[in-house]
Regions:
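Flexible "cap/lid" subdomain of the alpha/beta-hydrolase fold that forms the substrate-access gate
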Residues: 2-19, 25-29, 46, 51, ...
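Histidine-centered active-site/metal-ligand motif
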Residues: 43, 111, 282
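Active-site machinery of serine-nucleophile hydrolases
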Residues: 60-70
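Hydrophobic pocket-lining residues within nucleotide cofactor-binding pockets
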Residues: 71, 280
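Typically the conserved alpha-helix immediately C-terminal to a functionally engaged Cys/Sec
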Residues: 54-58
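Catalytic histidine-centered segment of alpha/beta-hydrolase-like enzymes
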Residues: 281-293
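C-terminal alpha-helical cap of glycosyltransferases
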Residues: 293-300
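Short beta-strand element of the alpha/beta-hydrolase
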Residues: 36-43
Length: 300
């Protein structure tokens, strides 16, 4: 199903909506007109496509086609009872978007936990990838990478009885989410960025976990597979290193978890990459969207 949404000038540009059937529900997609290769924007664990709301107008103003979508189980995409979520499913979601929209070559833009989808898509479908853009994301092992506390809690499956009990108490789970956000915010330097991020991102994450049906099953299933996925991706590092596709690494340097050391490790491993470290936190596309867009649109 496809329809057009028009928004006021200076708000989000006009886009087409798509709902792509994945067998256990449909993916929600927004497609903004422009020249190709299209930027295909992907989100991480606790959020959804809205993390790109401030970035997209700059990319569209630069004349480029932009596609943003919610992985199954998150945001506006379906969250069917009994649905199974995995990193392989997210990679397939990306492939389904490319096929449904008839895109030839794309620029996967990966943030946070969508790093595996973006990088593995480049490995598996290099003929469809013009370049790759990585924003404070993870893939395999990296010497300085740290796991956020709430992610580590749910990733340790031997703590399942504890995390299941936590989920039975909305107040305690909300406290855990707010604690994690505070850990990201305390490493940021710019007070205006801190305030804006808290006001912008807080409702996005809250809606993901409080509006029914919620993203909680997808979050729980994805985090429980994290360590196995890191192991699988570490084995694929030689395939990543062999890619001759250009990579842009755009990194907020105030991220205590997926820190600049992670970006430097990517840069050292990749055959064809540029590294851009910016004064921002983990969600740099929210903190400094104009600067991020300028690098994405550049010919470097």
């Amino acid at each position: 199903m496809t329809n057009t949404i028009n928004k006021p000038f200076n708000a989000t540009p006009a886009y087409l909506e798509h709902h792509i059937d994945r067998g256990q529900g449909s993916i929600y997609v927004r497609d903004y007109e422009g020249s190709e290769p299209a930027f295909v924007l992907m989100h991480g664990f606790p959020d959804n496509l809205h993390i790109y709301d401030d970035l997209i107008p700059h990319l569209v103003a630069g004349g480029r086609r932009v596609v943003a979508f919610d992985f199954l189980g998150f945001g506006y995409s379906d969250k069917q009872t009994g649905a199974r979520y995995s990193y392989e499913q997210q990679l397939s979601d990306l492939h389904a978007v490319v096929e449904h929209l008839g895109l030839d070559k794309i620029v996967p833009v990966a943030h946070d936990a969508s790093g595996p989808a973006g990088i593995n898509y480049a490995i598996d479908y290099p003929e469809h990838v013009a370049s790759v853009c990585l924003l404070n994301c993870a893939y395999g092992v990296a010497p300085t990478k740290k796991t956020p506390e709430i992610i580590g809690l749910f990733a340790h499956t031997d703590l399942k009885s504890y995390t299941q009990a936590l989920l039975q108490s909305p107040e305690q789970f909300e406290w855990a989410l707010k604690f994690q956000m505070s850990k990201f915010l305390e490493h940021m330097k710019d007070d205006s960025q801190i305030q804006y991020l808290a006001n912008f991102l807080g409702p996005i994450i809250e809606t993901n976990f409080t509006k029914h049906p919620t993203s909680t099953p997808a979050f729980v299933q994805m985090t429980s597979q994290l360590f196995e996925e890191v192991t699988r991706n570490t084995k694929r590092l030689p395939e990543m290193e062999a890619l001759d596709i250009p990579f842009k690494l755009i990194w907020g340097d105030h991220d205590p978890y997926l820190n600049t050391g992670v970006a430097e490790d990517f840069h050292a491993r990749l055959k064809n990459s540029s590294l851009h470290v910016l004064p921002a936190g983990h969600w740099l596309q929210i903190d400094i969207p104009e600067q991020v867009a300028a690098i994405m649109l550049s010919n470097e």
